[in-house]
């Protein structure tokens, strides 16, 4: 593929316009107004000389602040952190305090990540009160139900992550926690709001240095346990999609806490997830990218000073760690525009070297305004909704599909629109590529090692983690055995901070459904409401 010119237009597609107006625009705003509101409010008190340059970068979608910035900046309660990372200890007081913090965090728009490993297992004796413990899973389910009934901003479902260590006695019940019956999956397919166990929570088994030592040492008393845990999770990844793995080894040992999408890590209770992403697809030169690394770092640092907090413990941890989550999006489009496949290359490595300089940049800007230097600065988020607005590929993901139906929540009702991926449309219409020839996540699903290898390679430049979903063929279509997949994956685990897989159709109510290009082409901008499993047009001209 020859080098392609990069997008220059600033006009939203119909679907991106719908999402922007529904989720982020304040009354009377257009996108440039939103960019000005967010950047001027957050940065002017700290770095006024950067406001004009950064506002233009956001207006042209070269930098995309996290969704909480777009939604909450300028509001009376401006909580602009995407997520909170929480601990719980094995006591009634700690559990009660956790539930209060969860409700407060969710109601102010933050996703929640919790590690439950400190709680004693189900059936263990409770000496003080007598009786036995319910174990961590019961409390995970309680948090999930809290999230079910809290609509963030009236439209956004609560986002929750639960982690449990591989050596916890309840880990096998945890692994099977989201084994939904066929009836439940069918109900989810008809109505995404239908009840299913833990349906608002992503779950991961946490692997640490002790796991790898036990797995490799036949003499270890935990050797068989480690193997059983690993292979049962692999089986679930390839069939039900959950749980995934979270990995904390070497210099990252002890950083077990995660945000809801798992790209931000910490060892400290009440830590934050503070996100914004550089859109590589709209950049022509490495020098421009380097400048955006500096601007984005300064913006997020200012955000740690601007954002209010849902409870006091967050302010204390934030002042100590001041974590930034400077991310990337549009990597796949950047690769295609330069004629590269979805794999490592020297040019991208040289750009990532500039990305890694955010550590030094953050320390320099922190000293200027008299705050602590961020302990870590880079995290690649999945950038789902923000990726829609940027109209490029999300995070490090390949192109999901050339065309699809995307479901979204509007109030309490589910709607969908046909979408031709903005990147795919540019390739089809401007460069005369055949839609069937564009490599997508579904094509790469047949070669999962390429996806895993690329994630492990990019992770070298990321001091937090990368949130990425490994799309796989449906259970009956996989061309590899569980053993082949598991052995391949194990070889990469020490170089990853986490891994999540999604076999096609493994859960009902998928938000994205792949459709042929011809089906979606010409049908964009029409909004459909799902009524009893059927589709009713509620806007535009209904031609399908």
Language-model features: where?
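Acidic/polar, glycine-rich intrinsically disordered N-terminal extensions of enzymes
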Residues: 1-80, 86, 487, 500-522, ...
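Conserved, charged catalytic cores of large soluble enzymes
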Residues: 2-48, 128-142, 152-254, 328-361
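Function-dense linear segments that define catalytic or interfacial modules
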Residues: 21, 26, 38-47, 55-128, ...
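Extended active-site and interfacial segments that coordinate phosphate-rich ligands
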Residues: 96-104, 120, 132-144, 178-194, ...
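Internal maturation/activation junctions in enzymes
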Residues: 297-315, 319, 330, 335-383, ...
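Secondary-structure capping and boundary motifs in well-ordered enzyme cores
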Residues: 12, 30, 73-77, 91, ...
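Catalytic alpha/beta core of large soluble enzyme barrels
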Residues: 256-269, 276, 300-307, 382, ...
